[in-house]
Every structure is written in C-alpha cells, then in structure tokens.
Amino acid sequence: MGRRRRRLPREPFEIAITGLSHEGRGIAHHDERTLFVHGALPGERVRAVYTKRRRSVAEARVVEVVSPAPERIAPHCPHFGVCGGCSLQHLTPERQVELKQSVLMEQFHHMGGVQPERVLAPLTGAPWGYRRKARLAVKHVPRKGGVLVGFREKHSPFVAEMDRCPVLDPRVGERLTELGRLIEGLSIPDRVPQIEVALGDETGALVFRNLAPLTAADLNRLAGFARDSGLAVYQQPGNEATMALVHDPVGRRLDYALPGHGVRLGFRPGDFTQVNAEINRAMVDQALDLLAVEPGQRVLDLFCGLGNFTLPLARRASEVVGVEGAEALVERGRENALRNGLDNVRFYGADLTLAAADQPWATGGFDRVLLDPPRSGAFEVLGLVAALGPKRIVYVSCGPATLARDAGELVHRHGYRLTAAGVMDMFPHTAHVESMAVFQREAQD
C-alpha cells in the first residue's frame, strides 16, 4: 500500500523574501526548506500559503503583502494572480527587464563560463496589446454560465474566468467573452478545446479546434463572426493538415512588414512567427546592424523559418542561404522571396540536429552566419558553422541556458569572442528571456 500524501498546512505564515528566481518568484527560506513564492518580490515581508511541499523545496503563493518592495506596482489586469498567462505584472517594467538581463548574465557565467565584452541595451516596446500569436484554452462550464475562453489558471489546469486580456492584440484580447458566447451557441460547445490566434499587420485568423463535426448551422454561425470581426475563421478537426477555411471576410493572406528592409512576409495560421511585431522589427534591425554585412558577402541563416531574417539580409548581401527543418516554412520562405522580387536567396530543408559537412547548403564558405534556433539551442551544428569560416555570428535565442552553453562552445572550442549580448523584451510581464549575442573570430576582419 502506497504512502498517503500529507496534506499541506492551510494556515498562512509570514516570511521575508530574499531573492527572485529566474521565473519571477520570490525566494525565501522557511521550515528548513527553500521556498519559491508566487507574487512576492525581494525585500518584502509577505503572508503566504503552501501550494506544494517536498523534503527540501516548497512552493507558496502570497495572500497578503505585509511590507511591499519599492518596485511593486498594482497589476494592470484584474485576472493577474489567477490567470497563468503573466507572472510579473506586479513588477515595474524597468525591473522586469533588469531581471531578464541578470538571468542572461548568470547563465553565461554558470553554463558557458563566459561573459560578453559589451552588454547591449535592451530592446523594449509597448507592454500591452503586443501579443499576436497565442493558443487560447476553451472550456464549456455550464455552472459558470457558458464557455470560458482564455489562458489556464496559474495553479490549476482549469481555464481562468476572464472577460478580456490586455496583453493580447485587442483584435482578439477584447473579444474573449464574445468568443465564449460564439462557442456556446454551437452544437458542440463541449468539443471545442482550443482556439489558435494568428494575426498579421492588417489581417488575422482564428483556428477553432473541433473534436466533433460542425453542422451547417455551426459553420454559418462561425462565418457570421468572421464577417463581424474581420478575422478569418478556420476549423481543425484533426492535425494541422486538416485545417480548413470556414470564411475569410477580407480575402487577403496573413502577412507583416519589415519597413526598414522593404519586405513583406506572408504566413499561414499554423506557421511560426514572432508574437511581438514591434520587438520583431527592432530585433531584425539590430541583428542586421550587428552582422554588419558588406557588399559581396555570403550569409548563412540557420533555423531561418519563413525568412524573417533571410529576406532582409538578401537586401544587403551578395547571396543568402536559409536552412530550416520544417518543410512548410521552407516553402513559405521561397514564396516570400518570390513575392519580394529577391533572386539572391536560396532556401533548403534540413534537420539541423544532424548537420553534416556534405549538406548541399554547406558549401563555399560564409562570411556571416545568423542562428535563430528553438529553445533547445544549436549545439549540434556549431562545429559545422565554425568550419564554414564566418568571422562574425549573430545568435538569436529564446533560451538563455542553451545560448550560454553554446556560447561556451563557440568561445572555448572554436576560437570566437563573445563581443556583445543583451535581452529583448519579447514577452512583457512574463519571465520568458529572449536575447541576442554576437561572436567574432579572434582574427579581426
């Protein structure tokens, strides 16, 4: 017979917060345990209750702030603390960015044994209404009056009860209640678990995941919402290949512009694109400035997606090669190059975790390389990248630990210097750390 799990004590207890974790939780010590406290900041005294407790580590949440820290602010969103979409709204935006910068530098030190020669100024933008890509949870809850649409609760798998979301682009963030009513009126309100949000500059799309067939009346209802909202509506009964258009009131592809580089990039609802258009524009500008591509040079863009960096690079370089593992994005990159009239760029599909020197794209050497890998990093391809001879590498990262690991490899094994690094606040009010680093060969160009 298994051991019974001990019940957590329900009584609040008072503690002093001494630090802040990488995830934005307060750190304290209580009952001979390291305690991570949701909603607490360094220097505060708070009353908290346990949410999880193990032998040496425990978690808790704040029920009362006894003495607040100077950087504490009132959360903008009334759902903060319950909704799991944000974790840092109680912290000033400036301090949020400082936290992310410190996380990056700590990871460089601990994971890579390196430090940048120069810290880049953080890229920041509008803190609200920035999010263009999201996966919204949906739950039919008759006892709460219908269908809930939003993010899941911080401390449970339930969907948070929310009427709006201020971090979402208002084209969707102001329509959560409307979306709930829409689904409630379908014949299968309990069989629609998710809505995928994909927004471009002027157009947008919602993909309704349906686990049972929609009736003709359901499709008419969804089409009516599309006409009223101006957003294209899709249904998806199975995997991504089953996605089918219900109605597009605009009849234009999803796309976004990079005005500083004279390109527009089209995409489909299921494609990967950056969630924050303002930061994405600043990120592309900074990456190209740091690469410092000169006329006549060849550039390699690894993990290139649909051409977010590739096409702007093609405006400056003699030749650009983009390599991506997802074939759908490779095709999108080619389409985008054609639409933008760029004939000096080639896209290849390849699994970059199995990079080998005999790849058709890995020929001729490159003057510059841009890396934009997933959270798992680019470790497997670094040896090949170094062998291709680029004097400068710009690495765009969504995982500070893997960036730091890869930085250590480039510096200690392959003879590069980490000349600069800094953060980009792609996800304000969350603990997500996006960053950029520049590597230079010891021989100056």
Curated annotation (Swiss-Prot):
Keywords: 4Fe-4S, Iron, Iron-sulfur, Metal-binding, Methyltransferase, rRNA processing, S-adenosyl-L-methionine, Transferase. [4Fe-4S] cluster binds at C77, C83, C86, C165. It catalyses: uridine(1939) in 23S rRNA + S-adenosyl-L-methionine = 5-methyluridine(1939) in 23S rRNA + S-adenosyl-L-homocysteine + H(+). One of its GO terms (molecular function) is rRNA (uridine-C5-)-methyltransferase activity. InterPro entries: 23S_rRNA_MeTrfase_RlmD (IPR001566), MeTrfase_TrmA_AS (IPR030390), MeTrfase_TrmA_CS (IPR030391), NA-bd_OB-fold (IPR012340), SAM-dependent_MTases_sf (IPR029063), TRAM_dom (IPR002792), U5_MeTrfase_fam (IPR010280). The keyword Nucleotidyltransferase does not apply. The active site is at C398 (nucleophile). It comes from the Bacteria. Residues 6-64 form the TRAM domain. Gene3D superfamilies: 2.40.50.1070, Nucleic acid-binding proteins, Vaccinia Virus protein VP39. GO terms for biological process: rRNA base methylation. S-adenosyl-L-methionine binds at Q274, F303, N308, E324, D351, D372. Transmembrane segments: none annotated. Belongs to the class I-like SAM-binding methyltransferase superfamily. RNA M5U methyltransferase family. RlmD subfamily. Catalyzes the formation of 5-methyl-uridine at position 1939 (m5U1939) in 23S rRNA. This is 23S rRNA (uracil(1939)-C(5))-methyltransferase RlmD. The lineage of its organism: Bacteria, Pseudomonadati, Pseudomonadota, Gammaproteobacteria, Chromatiales.
